[in-house]
Amino acid sequence: MVNAMVERATSEMLIGPDWAMNLEICDMLNSDPAQAKDVVKGIKKRIGSRNPKAQLLALTLLETIVKNCGDMVHMHVAEKGVIHEMVRIVKKKPDFHVKEKILVLIDTWQEAFGGPRARYPQYYAGYQELLRAGAVFPQRSERSAPVFTPPQTQPLTSYPPNLRNAGPGNDVPEPSAEPEFPTLSLSEIQNAKGIMDVLAEMLSALEPGNKEDLKQEVMVDLVEQCRTYKQRVVHLVNSTSDESLLCQGLALNDDLQRVLTNYEAIASGLPGTSSQIEKPKSETGKSLVDVDGPLIDTGDSSNQANGATSSSGNGVLNQLALPAPPVTNGSANSKIDLLSGDDLALVPVGPPQPASPVASDQNALALIDMFSDNTNNPSPATAPSGNPAQNIPLNPQGHQQPNSQAGEAGLQQSNGFAPQVGYSQFEQPSYGQGVSSPWSSQPAQQPVQPSYGAQDSTAFPPPPWEAQLQDYSPSAESGSPFSPGMHPTQTAFTHAQPVNNNNPYPQIPQTGPPVNNNSPYAQMPQTGQAVANISPYPQIPQNGVYMPNQPNQALGSGYQPQQQQQQQMMMAQYYAQQQQLQQQQQQQAYGNQMGGYGYGYNQQQQGSSPYLDQQMYGLSMRDQTSHQVASSSSTTSYLPPMKPKNKPEDKLFGDLVDISKFKPTKPTSGRAGTM
């Protein structure tokens, strides 16, 4: 039976030690020590097995019975040759785990059983034999169980206690342990904080060197309560699993430790401790925010320079306050300010001009709808009427050479190109010969003497809208992405006629001839009369001036001859509408009747350079299909007109150039695709 139990405890089928069977064997040996001989004999047999697992399980069982059983087992282990068998196995170089287990057991036993003069010297003899064989004993763990089990002081729990021996005199004294404290609750933590604050206030009010006040009953009681709470907090930290309660307990423990340390320092007579009691808490808050300067820029330079000298009451709040909203300065050097109500400025397209203001009370612009789909915007924003100057300088060339380019202000509409209906302000191509300015809603009131094209004595004073835009021409902006730069020697001719405004909406003054908004299409500048918006049809000659209207599509493709008859009929209606206005404004025309055409006929009469070389510089091209502005020509060049196919009217182009051959009374159908 005993051998069967040992066989089951050391079976090779086990994954690990069968502790239930091992303890059962120990109980059997403790109850019947006579069974120890058979058990030790069976274990010795299993130790000599060739299976390393069986050897390890047998060694584990041997260790268990040596530690848990009495002197009878120790004697049989020493006398039955178990130690000698273990030394022999080590010398045979067995499995590593088996060898290490044997070395640990022999080293432990030789120390426990007392050396060569002990009761059982076999343990020490086996240890010395292994040392002579060169075995290296591993270091023992200090947490290993002792070889001898301490004597039993209480009856086993598995057996019922002896009720007859029960009495007050037979009670076994319990070992002294740490006193149990009830777990701290949130309310008790708050109470402890209040007691700690009262003690801290009393300590801070003490005079330096006065130890008599420390003996007051109230202070002694507070110190005692703080020490008790500190012990309870330590117990709470070691036992609780609530994270929030643990966090508050740790914070309370730090505060209690600080206050008790200050109390002990005052009691020991250390100088300068009573005045430093409340400082650590406030300095801790400051150090988290302000080390060398404020972590958050509040916009106050004094706080940044002297961040450490701020008041203790508002120091932390000032550091944690959100920064004030930045103050926008529209007149500094901002490129665009479309949202502020005080400074309404448009983006200067060219390079920055330090000498010219961008946005001020005298230089305010009205915001217009930059993305309107129709040029005849029913409700454009207008500038205040009381402001005399309403244009910003957008032309660096005109600003740098105001005398030589006085005629540049009239370049709008001078070559017969105007914004196409249906495109926004940014999509409308601004050709090099001029486009009506969309940025001014009222004519300016500052007359300047410009140099007109003919420079004859019959020239009238400049119109008010040209006087303001003389030096600043948006269409001649060299850096504009929408219009190429203009040649410095260009001149154009303007008309000093008022705008014929028949619709209820305010008109946009143009640097060229005024605009008549009777039709949705713009007409070319005509001698002595206002100009309507674009019309994609050619104009009827009036007063000897041939005014061809050139739409955007004429630049990219030839005009269709089959539509000329219908267009001439429509132009006849326009001619009748303009006849009245022509008679009223006939006396205001310039000396040269061809000045409004914009091709430089007046310069040709003056003997100047060829008009094409001067007027075609920087002329940009726009294709109706792609809606993209072509790159400007960098040098003065002659751009030949795009000739439509199969047009018999090409022979009339000589009449346009030669003024002497021009017949004002006979209408001629001009080219629609000329530049």
Swiss-Prot record:
SUPFAM superfamilies in the cross-refs: ENTH/VHS domain, GAT-like domain
Domain of life (superkingdom): Eukaryota
Family to which this protein belongs: Belongs to the TOM1 family.
Subunit structure: Interacts with ELC/VPS23A and ELCL/VPS23B.
Keyword field: Cytoplasm, Membrane, Protein transport, Transport
Biased composition (Polar residues): 299-317, 372-435, 470-481, 488-524
InterPro entries (alphabetical): ENTH_VHS, GAT_dom, GAT_sf, TOL_plant, VHS_dom
GO terms assigned for molecular function: phosphatidylinositol binding; ubiquitin binding
Family annotation (Pfam families): GAT (PF03127), VHS (PF00790)
Biased composition (Low complexity): 436-451
Domain (GAT) ranges: 180-268
All copies of domain VHS, residue ranges: 9-138
Role summary: Might contribute to the loading of the ESCRT machinery.
Any GO BP annotation: protein transport to vacuole involved in ubiquitin-dependent protein catabolic process via the multivesicular body sorting pathway
Gene3D superfamilies for this protein: 1.20.58.160, 1.25.40.90
Subcellular location: Cytoplasm; Membrane
Protein name in the entry: TOM1-like protein 9
Gene Ontology CC: cytoplasm; membrane
Membrane topology: Peripheral membrane protein
Tissue specificity as recorded in UniProt: Ubiquitously expressed.
Amino acid composition bias (Basic and acidic residues), ranges on this chain: 646-661
Record keyword Ubl conjugation present: no
Cysteine pairings via disulfide bonds: none
UniProt region (Disordered), positions on chain: 144-181, 270-322, 371-524, 542-561, 622-675
Gene name per UniProt: TOL9
